[in-house]
């Protein structure tokens, strides 16, 4: 390993892949990407932290304690970042850690060192990478880009940022992992066309479709599953070994952790060999690659279903995909190669080590961010997208979308709303995220009240709602009430509501219920229109009853009753027809009311002129 004794003139800029199973960092020196190695020339750092009473060890050293002291050795923490206690217990029921609920429904680990959060664990991994960089280059880190899965929600991104702050690393941007991979390949080969990035890591699966053209990387669409990855292969293989071994009477933390480590080791060997001998306590047996393939095939099919749905969503065929980039350690598995290649009907792009490609892309990107503005030769523009639509709740419990899914980032959009009732002095603003029509089927991000609004008639108050989403996907909201200039600004902190987000499932539900949701919304909006019309008409009749004859009033009352009955029966077509009839029979009344208002206004003006 080379150490730089002199302080380097160039800024030290790091691209960091903070992974589920392994983490690594890279930097650009003399137009070449350098992977940061430890003293034993290893570029990978296991994402594992061991906590003793007065000592913390990270990486390979911590990994040695995973079977001996599983309760105090935290691994794959990325899967737990930003998750609630309920989610963790449901999804990972046999974790060996002592997990408890924090005050925000999140989690912390009880360790010999003390109470440790997933943010703390992530920060300790980042500190180790930071130390590696400082030792190697004999200078402090100036800036870094850290990669995250494309489907990390806002809260998970914020927790990643907090981990960077705790580690003392100057983070200037979060970058989607698939986008980083595209940067790594795109800058080398200057690709032009549509590229799909298939990223199967230890804890997450992400797929992104990008349009590459002369240095512009536009993310057309993204999807994935934040709870699908190589760890699931390990769990499934561990269950298979457990069943074969007939050791069901043994079940403690040490036993479970040992079983999982054997499963991981067996999986790695099966990427090279057709048959592997397994020793587990008193049991000895064999696992073949064919058997392993049967265990994991459903997981792989699930990733391909997600790819298929995404292609369908943006009206692309498999034939239109020019290249498929393979990212993530789990793509080393032969069956993954075979099935993905078969699905896309082409050879896969895998010339860059799938473990390294994300860190390489991140290093290239942070280097470009600090390049001279005049040096446009290898400039790249990254256009990421919004993973889910953003909107606010409107009358009837519906969602009015302001920024739609797969909109390029950064983005700022404003939409105007108004009041529903007379003399409102406050308005509840409910911000939601999702693809469904009803608020109850979407994710609640934030609720707050805009107060001290000047009382006015319904529809006269103008409320401007502005959503700004930055390049990291963080959401900034500004609410402005024009008349009284009341304003509120917030940055969304989804500390509870987004913790259990499974975007893949959200999109499936949206497609499944789209027809029913549409018809329900149309019917409910018609009902709201009917109720509002009846309210306005009743108020006008009380005030201007003398303007119409008894015969005309009788017609109006009769049609009102029919419309009221339609509302109670929840019949869309009946509501539509009776509302139309009510408009017809009350047209003359509203004309007389308008004429009367004009006449009264004219009289007032004449009186003013003659006073």
Curated annotation (Swiss-Prot):
<dbReference type="InterPro" id="IPR013126">
    <property type="entry name" value="Hsp_70_fam"/>
</dbReference>
<comment type="function">
    <text>Chaperone involved in the maturation of iron-sulfur cluster-containing proteins. Has a low intrinsic ATPase activity which is markedly stimulated by HscB. Involved in the maturation of IscU.</text>
</comment>
<dbReference type="InterPro" id="IPR043129">
    <property type="entry name" value="ATPase_NBD"/>
</dbReference>
<keyword id="KW-0547">Nucleotide-binding</keyword>
<protein>
    <recommendedName>
        <fullName>Chaperone protein HscA</fullName>
    </recommendedName>
</protein>
<dbReference type="GO" id="GO:0140662">
    <property type="term" value="F:ATP-dependent protein folding chaperone"/>
</dbReference>
<dbReference type="InterPro" id="IPR018181">
    <property type="entry name" value="Heat_shock_70_CS"/>
</dbReference>
<dbReference type="InterPro" id="IPR029047">
    <property type="entry name" value="HSP70_peptide-bd_sf"/>
</dbReference>
<dbReference type="GO" id="GO:0016887">
    <property type="term" value="F:ATP hydrolysis activity"/>
</dbReference>
<dbReference type="Pfam" id="PF00012">
    <property type="entry name" value="HSP70"/>
</dbReference>
<comment type="similarity">
    <text>Belongs to the heat shock protein 70 family.</text>
</comment>
<dbReference type="InterPro" id="IPR029048">
    <property type="entry name" value="HSP70_C_sf"/>
</dbReference>
<dbReference type="GO" id="GO:0016226">
    <property type="term" value="P:iron-sulfur cluster assembly"/>
</dbReference>
<dbReference type="InterPro" id="IPR042039">
    <property type="entry name" value="HscA_NBD"/>
</dbReference>
<dbReference type="InterPro" id="IPR010236">
    <property type="entry name" value="ISC_FeS_clus_asmbl_HscA"/>
</dbReference>
<dbReference type="GO" id="GO:0051082">
    <property type="term" value="F:unfolded protein binding"/>
</dbReference>
<dbReference type="GO" id="GO:0005524">
    <property type="term" value="F:ATP binding"/>
</dbReference>
<keyword id="KW-0346">Stress response</keyword>
<keyword id="KW-0067">ATP-binding</keyword>
<keyword id="KW-0143">Chaperone</keyword>
């Amino acid at each position: 390993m080379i150490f730089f004794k002199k302080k380097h003139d160039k800024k030290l800029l790091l691209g960091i892949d903070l992974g589920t199973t392994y983490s690594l960092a890279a930097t650009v020196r003399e137009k070449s990407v350098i992977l940061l190695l430890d003293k034993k020339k290893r570029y990978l750092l296991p994402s594992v932290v061991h906590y003793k009473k007065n000592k913390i060890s990270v990486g390979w050293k911590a990994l040695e304690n995973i079977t001996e002291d599983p309760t105090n050795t935290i691994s794959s923490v990325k899967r737990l970042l930003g998750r609630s206690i309920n989610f963790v217990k449901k999804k990972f029921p046999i974790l060996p850690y002592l997990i408890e609920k924090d005050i925000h429904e999140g989690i912390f680990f009880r360790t010999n060192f003390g109470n440790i959060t997933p943010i703390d664990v992530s920060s300790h991994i980042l500190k180790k990478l930071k130390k590696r960089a400082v030792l190697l280059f004999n200078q402090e880190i100036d800036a870094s880009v850290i990669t995250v899965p494309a489907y990390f929600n806002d809260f998970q991104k914020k927790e990643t940022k907090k981990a960077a702050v705790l580690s003392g690393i100057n983070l200037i941007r979060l970058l989607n992992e698939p986008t980083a991979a595209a940067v790594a390949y795109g800058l080398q080969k200057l690709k032009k066309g549509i590229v799909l990035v298939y990223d199967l890591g230890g804890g997450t699966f992400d797929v992104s479709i990008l349009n590459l053209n002369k240095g512009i990387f536009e993310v057309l669409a993204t999807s994935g599953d934040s709870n699908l990855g190589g760890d699931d292969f390990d769990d499934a293989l561990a269950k298979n070994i457990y069943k074969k071994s007939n050791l069901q009477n043994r079940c403690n933390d040490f036993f479970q952790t040992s079983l999982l480590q054997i499963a991981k080791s067996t999986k790695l060997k099966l990427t090279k060999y057709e048959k592997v001998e397994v020793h587990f306590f008193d049991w000895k047996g064999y696992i073949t690659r064919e058997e392993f393939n049967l265990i994991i095939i459903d997981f792989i099919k699930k990733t391909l279903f997600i790819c298929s749905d995404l292609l369908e969503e943006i009206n692309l065929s498999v034939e239109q995909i020019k290249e498929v980039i393979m990212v993530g350690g789990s793509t080393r598995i032969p069956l993954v190669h075979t099935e993905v290649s078969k699905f896309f009907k082409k050879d896969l792009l895998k010339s860059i080590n799938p473990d390294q490609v994300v860190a390489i892309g991140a290093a290239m990107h942070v280097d470009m961010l600090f390049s001279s503005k005049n040096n446009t030769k290898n400039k790249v523009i990254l256009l990421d997208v919004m993973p889910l639509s953003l909107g606010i709740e409107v009358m009837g419990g519906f969602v009015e979308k302001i920024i739609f899914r797969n909109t390029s980032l950064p983005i700022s959009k404003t939409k105007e709303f108004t009041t529903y009732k007379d003399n409102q002095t406050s308005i509840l603003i409910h911000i939601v995220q999702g693809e469904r029509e009803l608020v109850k089927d979407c994710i609640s991000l934030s609720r707050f009240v805009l107060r001290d609004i000047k009382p006015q008639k319904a529809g006269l108050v103008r409320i401007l709602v502005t959503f700004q989403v930055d390049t990291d996907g963080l959401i900034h909201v500004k609410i402005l009430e024009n008349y009284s200039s009341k304003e509120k600004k917030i940055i969304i902190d989804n500390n509870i509501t987004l913790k259990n987000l499974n975007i893949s499932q959200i999109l499936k539900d949206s497609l499944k219920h789209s027809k029913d949701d549409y018809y329900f919304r149309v019917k409910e909006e018609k009902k709201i229109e009917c109720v509002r019309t009846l309210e306005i008409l009743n108020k006008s009749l009380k005030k201007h009853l003398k303007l119409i004859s008894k015969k005309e009033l009788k017609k109006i009352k009769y049609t009102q009753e029919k419309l009221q009955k339609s509302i109670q029966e929840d019949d869309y077509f009946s509501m539509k027809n009776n509302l139309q009839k009510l408009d017809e029979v009350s047209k003359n009344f509203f004309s007389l009311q308008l004429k009367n208002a004009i006449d009264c206004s004219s009289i007032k003006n004449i009186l003013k002129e003659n006073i």
